[in-house]
């Protein structure tokens, strides 16, 4: 195969970035915007020895699972929705198969065991308009007009769009007010290459249970000229609760700055997951799909199977979202998180919910737990620290082996693993199964419909119980 070759390909799988995967005479091709079941004509744009990348030129025979009219006309250009052109039922089947395949292949979990413990994926009734948070870059088009939207896949080129199919409806109104304000008052948009211009991004957060709205303008400066004019328009939107600016003068592609200045209202909004209330600031980590998060955490609580006498460790606890869920049913919960701001939020969230049996530690889970285990042994005459249940919700890279070993050494009866990457989940499950734990329940949860991402909740139990 060579660059510019035109080939006909039957698509058999989806890659980690959402690309369709097919083979021509044993040669693997990755083709963006093609889905499983399509037969496509594609032009090779990059040819390696054993695989290549091709551009979709024509759909010869569409898959029976192809959506005739995608909900968002920008889907192919924008980097946000990789598989929006696939019917939702097929998306769920693909994600469930991906989790199962990784557990079989990487985790070496026997098929018979998976048949027994794996539950069907938990999907959404309405797989659009589910995101409670959106970050919109601000820039200019070729004519110099101020625009906002989303970055095209793997670029920092803005695709103009104020009406994202995954975001809430009020986003469009807010963005239009901000764009008009900037044009009318000659407020400049940030230019990433030149590091000039004022407004970099707009962050919008929405409380699904409270209808509270936050708007935060990320700025390459300390002050927004004519801010009162913008505030006057925005605060008339029903539910508007917080209008702030985030100062970010660094030459970086990190979106938020660390300094938040209040323009109007308060610096946070509130929302609920189940009956637990959370205060969410512009810098808070908070799950973006509250409908599915409630199901996800409900499963984690179910798998922990608490009776009120347990000591629970929640590793990578963020702002305490899972910890505070668990604290309602446990004797004591300890949460660990590396981000100090998140721990401040976690402690505050415990306080506003009158939860007194949750303590939080700042630090790397990989360091805090082994250190606690070691110090406990030293101060208790060699007696080992014990936890009844350990919950982990790590980033995509999964858990470090040293942390997994400490978990095993602490001999919890149950381990609940919440994963956003089924490949690293499978690797870690393999370690735990080889160290005396067995799979009891697995449920994938579609936290991000129309994308390739999938969350999974796994319950493991010590074999000698």
Regions found by a protein language model. Name each.
Residues 119-127, 192-193, 201, 205, ...:
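Short, solvent-exposed loop/turn elements at beta->coil junctions and helix N-caps
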Residues 203-207, 212-223:
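Carbohydrate-binding surface patches
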Residues 57-70, 76-189, 224:
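Extended interfacial segments that mediate partner engagement and assembly in macromolecular machines
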Residues 1-74, 359, 367:
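Terminal RNA-binding accessory module
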Residues 128-132, 211, 452-453:
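A short, glycine/Asx- and small/polar-enriched loop/turn
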Residues 20-25, 149-152, 216-218, 346:
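Short, acidic/hydrophobic/Gly-rich beta-strand patch recurrent on exposed beta strands
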Residues 2-8, 16, 20, 222-237, ...:
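Rossmann-like S-adenosyl-L-methionine
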Residues 43-47, 137-141, 205-209, 463:
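Short beta-strand micro-motifs enriched in acidic
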């Amino acid at each position: 195969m060579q660059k510019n070759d035109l080939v006909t390909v039957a698509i058999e799988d989806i890659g980690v970035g959402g690309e369709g995967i097919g083979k021509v005479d044993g040669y693997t091709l990755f083709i963006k915007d093609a889905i499983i079941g399509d037969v496509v004509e594609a032009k090779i744009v990059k040819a390696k020895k054993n695989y290549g990348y091709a551009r979709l030129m024509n759909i010869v025979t569409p898959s029976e699972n192809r959506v005739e009219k995608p909900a968002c006309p920008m889907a192919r250009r924008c980097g946000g929705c990789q598989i929006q052109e696939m019917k939702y039922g097929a998306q769920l089947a693909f994600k469930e198969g991906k989790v199962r395949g990784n557990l079989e292949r990487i985790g070496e979990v026997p098929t018979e065991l998976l048949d027994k413990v794996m539950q069907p994926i938990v999907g959404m009734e309405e797989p659009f308009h589910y995101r409670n948070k959106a970050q919109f870059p601000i820039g200019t088009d070729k004519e110099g007009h101020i625009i906002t939207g989303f970055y095209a896949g793997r670029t920092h080129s803005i695709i103009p769009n104020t009406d994202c199919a995954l975001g809430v409806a009020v986003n469009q109104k807010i963005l239009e007010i901000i764009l008009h304000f900037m044009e009318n008052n000659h407020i400049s948009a940030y230019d990433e290459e030149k590091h000039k211009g004022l407004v970099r991004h707009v962050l919008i957060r929405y409380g699904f249970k409270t209808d509270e709205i936050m708007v935060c303008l990320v700025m390459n400066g300390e002050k927004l000229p004519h801010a009162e004019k913008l505030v006057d328009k925005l605060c008339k939107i029903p539910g508007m609760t917080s209008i702030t600016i985030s100062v970010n003068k660094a030459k970086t592609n990190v979106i938020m700055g660390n300094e938040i200045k209040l323009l109007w209202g308060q610096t946070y909004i509130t929302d609920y997951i189940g009956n637990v209330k959370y205060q969410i600031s512009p810098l808070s980590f908070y799950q973006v799909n509250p409908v599915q998060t409630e199901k996800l955490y409900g499963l984690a609580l179910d798998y922990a199977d608490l009776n009120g006498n347990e000591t629970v460790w929640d590793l990578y606890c963020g702002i305490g979202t899972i910890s505070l869920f668990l604290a309602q049913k446990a004797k004591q919960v300890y949460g660990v998180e590396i981000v100090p701001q998140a721990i401040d939020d976690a402690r505050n969230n415990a306080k506003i919910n009158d939860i007194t049996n949750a303590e939080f530690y700042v630090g790397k889970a990989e360091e805090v737990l082994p250190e606690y285990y070691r110090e406990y042994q030293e101060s208790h005459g060699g007696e080992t620290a014990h936890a009844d249940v350990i919950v982990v919700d790590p980033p995509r890279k999964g858990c470090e082996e040293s942390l997994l070993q400490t978990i095993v050494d602490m001999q919890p009866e149950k381990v609940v693993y919440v994963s956003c990457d089924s490949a690293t989940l499978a690797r870690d499950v393999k370690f735990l199964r080889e160290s005396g734990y067995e799979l009891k329940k697995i449920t994938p949860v579609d936290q991000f419909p129309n994308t390739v991402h999938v969350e999974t909740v796994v319950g493991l139990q010590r074999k000698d119980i």
